[in-house]
From Swiss-Prot:
Its EC number is 1.14.13.-. Keywords: Disulfide bond, FAD, Flavoprotein, NADP, Nucleotide-binding, Oxidoreductase. This is Polycyclic ketone monooxygenase. It comes from Thermothelomyces thermophilus (strain ATCC 42464 / BCRC 31852 / DSM 1799) (Sporotrichum thermophile). InterPro entries: FAD-binding_Monooxygenases, FAD/NAD-bd_sf, FAD/NAD-binding_dom. GO terms for molecular function: nucleotide binding; oxidoreductase activity. Optimum pH is 6.5 to 9.0. Pfam families: Pyr_redox_2. Disulfide bonds join 424-596. FAD binds at residues 89, 113-114, 121, 124, 132-133, 139, 183, 492, 541. The lineage of its organism: Eukaryota, Fungi, Dikarya, Ascomycota, Pezizomycotina. NADPH binds at residues 277, 280, 301, 425, 452, 600. Polycyclic ketone monooxygenase (PockeMO) that displays excellent enantioselectivity, acts on various ketones, and is particularly active on polycyclic molecules. Breaks C-C bonds through the insertion of a single oxygen atom adjacent to a carbonyl moiety, yielding esters or lactones from ketones. PockeMO is able to convert linear ketones (including cyclohexane and to a lesser extend 4-octanone), cyclic ketones (including cyclohexanone and cyclooctanone), bicyclic ketones and polycyclic ketones (steroids). Performs oxidation of the keto functionalities at both the A and D rings of steroids. The polycyclic ketone monooxygenase accepts bulky and complex substrates and converts them with high efficiency, making it a promising candidate for application as an industrial biocatalyst.
Amino acid sequence: MAPSAEGASGAPTPEDLKLHQLSQKYTAEAAKRFRPEGLGQFIRLKEVGNERFRALAEDPWVDHAALNAKEPVKDGSRYKFIILGAGYGGLLYAVRLAEAGLASGPDDILMVDAAGGFGGTWWWNRYPGLHCDVESYSYMPLLEETGYIPKSKYAAGPELLEHAYRIATQWKLHDKALFRSNVKTIRWDDESRLWSLEVTEGRGPGQQSRELKLQARYVLLASGILTNPQVPKIPGLETFTGPVFHTARWNYDVTGGSPTDEALNRLEGKRVGIIGTGATAIQVVPKLAKYAKELYVFQRTPSGVWWRGQRPTDPVEWKTKIARKKGWQRERMLNLDSYLTDAAEEGQENMVADGWTEMPAFSAVIGSPRHGIVEPTPEKIAEHLGRLYKLDLPHAEQVRARTDSIVKDPKTAAKLKAWYPTWCKRPTFSDEYLQTFNLPNVHLVDTDGKGVDAANPSGLVVADKEYPLDILVLSTGYVTPSIGGGSPAVRTGVDIYGRGGKSLDDKWQTHGAATLHGVCSNGFPNLFFTPLSQSSQAANNAFTLDVGTEHIVQVIKTAEDRVDGDALVEVTSEAEEAWSFEIMKHAGWFASVTGCTPGYITSEGEALRKSEDPMEMAKRARSGNLSQGMASYMKLLQEYRADGSLKGFDISSRA
């Protein structure tokens, strides 16, 4: 559905006509990229049939000897809390539990992660050029509590990984983690009223894995949104004979350098290809271009690239303007979010003042408190889309004009322009990427939305032209967290069975999302998950994690205090249905994605497919979010917790 070409008086204005023409251009560009297989055009790296490619998913950073030297977790061990994930989300759970007085004993917490250490996405991703794309003062968790001062406005990958270890050290979590481990099943035992987990712990090459059965009173799911690298199903890809790797598992043995040394000297004299032009490639491409003899950038959909403005942290500014009072980091998160949700008040201080704060139309996918609920009628949705397109137009045109001003070759510049609304793909920021295409050794291979046609032993094929390569880099992203309707079980990659052996995934597939506040589901007592569906999201994922973990831990704390410890906490079916109905009322807002190009946000277009099945339509609506933005969601949760009643939960003593 496109915004209407008619103005308020009924006659189209010049701006209305321009917006209508733009929406038609967007629609045409999106149509080029739709593929009937949707998510099926990709496969998880660890599930690729070819053994050589499947091995690319293995952990290149793990120190097996050091981990094997630690005292092993005993089979049959029981914990108060088992947290699945040891990235920033899992660490926030552990810290919040400790600060609430819920986890002071040696067997109170166990964090389980497939990685070889703390850090989550910052453990796995160590590619050259890696930085967080959100300001580090707002993104890096617990800065106020640790007293750490980031080195620059946008922290580099090694610093982000180091910060995870800083948190683990300060809260003494090093001996409360089980790494290299995959949880296969989580099953509720009605008799013991405990969760039973089947876990496989890897021990490294030549070592037999350990099969463990663990028990927990509470299970907290902290799986991230960038955890499962995917690769496109390009015919013949497995026949390519040169080195190949995914950006999420960078191979410095091939490129030279290291995570802290971006001198990729082994690329000298090499023809390098990189597939993908998303948020990762924006950072990687300039680094590859410095050393490769020839660099070929294979593009399906260009990214909109805005200015970055990286700079070192000024100690005086930090003390006087940033960390100036208690609660400064939450305030800064809220301030950034207000600009992205079109909620900034006239004259308010712009604390972050970067490219993110110049795109209020991003509210199209995260919500805004400014406009209320959008009625799901054709007229109201068209009006809503028209307002969003109008809001986005100045910024979108500036982004495209910036491309023209930087890229010297007009044909290349035209191919690098993003013809879709700002909110359809993760916005990117760089003061190097576009400039790279002015270098004589860098070649843009635009596939006009089709993607790479095929691969052979010596390179890639696009539009019947072969591009010989020595090395191939896959910057092809991650499995969308909304796969499986956003089921926490699918997202975590674990089979979860609640009361009576009921499968959490089956519940999602049959009825759609069913939660209270997006964090727990009836039939699965003492199981909580980080908000995704039926909650709210922020461009700054650390804000989402901060709000979600705070709420979950406070709910548990209140329940434990009520029964003097050993609580059983379960949302009622009535409460989750009432919450699901509330979520469905907000679905009209997210019609904003109807004009989007296929990608991560739209599940490669699957979220845009029309359905006449009322059940399917209801399931989709239930899987949405609140449309007023993260600040409104946070306030709702705070008000909910304020009276201490925990309305909608059944709370009893487990004993």
